[in-house]
């Protein structure tokens, strides 16, 4: 392979670096238009409940409030989702998490928006909240969607796992748990919607997914995609957290009814509450090896909390399942993964899509094996590392190297040099 790279080793200037340094980059909240309205969302204050009554009349009567809308105002589809359409734009039957959107308000000033939100009254029939994966899986657990809380199931098997464990010289077994994480992007969710000079409903928004956004906004408003335009503003961080919808549909719905530009900027608290999170997972892993440290079998039982809505759950469970073995040759593999709905915050896309959680599991097991066998943790990794030509449990044959062995060896050399690795391990 030649060394005349176009990117590696070259200084590449980001296209928006100058604007950010000069302070001229326009983020979504920086956009304003004449006669623009401000918007806010009335959200659920309970995690699981049926709506008995919703009174918007007092909010609508406030002078300067131009729209107070619930799901009845949606002309098209009231369900969205990148893979499974299970999240309402505005709740129509029951709330499934704290912070579900129930109504939207547009008014002439931000203070009037808050006054209108405070004037809305609601009565709930509260339901049992499901906050653990264990409770979600119990037979008498109330279903959050449909008739079951099981969201996704994946199974991966390769070789003869049971027979392989019987031949192992050593077996280590443990349970690993990872917690829910929020992206904490610097810029909270924000957007502005308006009709352009040609009658195109346009949304300028902080997003990572403009083409998906357009389809969802168009579907909600029963418009063809050609009548909706999404403009991705300079985006102040996302890390996967802005792949889901945020303000797009709410702004667009208010502009659709008022025919005026509408701006919505979430507070830090609101953005953190309702944006997606990294999936919490629990993984029970059993790993077998020969006395010289060569892996023979891996068995994993994995559970994940996808929260109230699917978001990217189907993609996350798939990637977590196929990465349970890590970058190691394992001739016998069995993985059973199950993701469940709960009334917790929605889990979605977060850098790594389930692979970081799986890494906690397989790297913990490699450390446990090394300790039990009295081996150097780096040696056992090098011994089992994938090389070109290796066949994975998924059937994939590796045609190229990512330099794992070389990287481990270089890392150890540096560790010996700067911290006396041989003395501290």
From Swiss-Prot:
EC class (word): oxidoreductase
E.C. designation(s): 1.17.1.5
Membrane-spanning parts: none
Pathway: Cofactor degradation; nicotinate degradation; 6-hydroxynicotinate from nicotinate: step 1/1
Cofactor notes: Binds 1 Se-Mo-molybdopterin cytosine dinucleotide (Se-Mo-MCD) cofactor per heterotetramer. The cofactor is bound between the NdhL and NdhM subunits.
Cofactor(s) named in the record: Se-Mo-molybdopterin cytosine dinucleotide
Binding sites annotated in the UniProt record for Se-Mo-molybdopterin cytosine dinucleotide: 208, 238-240
Regulation: Reversibly inactivated by selenide and sulfide. Not inhibited by cyanide.
Catalytic function, reaction form: nicotinate + NADP(+) + H2O = 6-hydroxynicotinate + NADPH + H(+)
BP GO terms, sorted: nicotinate catabolic process
Molecular function in Gene Ontology: iron ion binding; nicotinate dehydrogenase activity
pH-related activity note: Most stable at pH 8.0. Unstable at acidic pH values.
Record-linked Pfam families: Ald_Xan_dh_C, MoCoBD_1
Alphabetically ordered keywords of this record: Metal-binding, Molybdenum, NADP, Oxidoreductase, Selenium
Known role: Catalyzes the hydroxylation of nicotinate to 6-hydroxynicotinate. Also active against 2-pyrazinecarboxylic acid, but inactive against other nicotinate analogs.
Entry's family note: Belongs to the xanthine dehydrogenase family.
Subunit structure comment from the entry: Heterooctamer of NDHM, NDHL, NDHS and NDHF. Dimer of heterotetramers.
Protein name: Nicotinate dehydrogenase large molybdopterin subunit
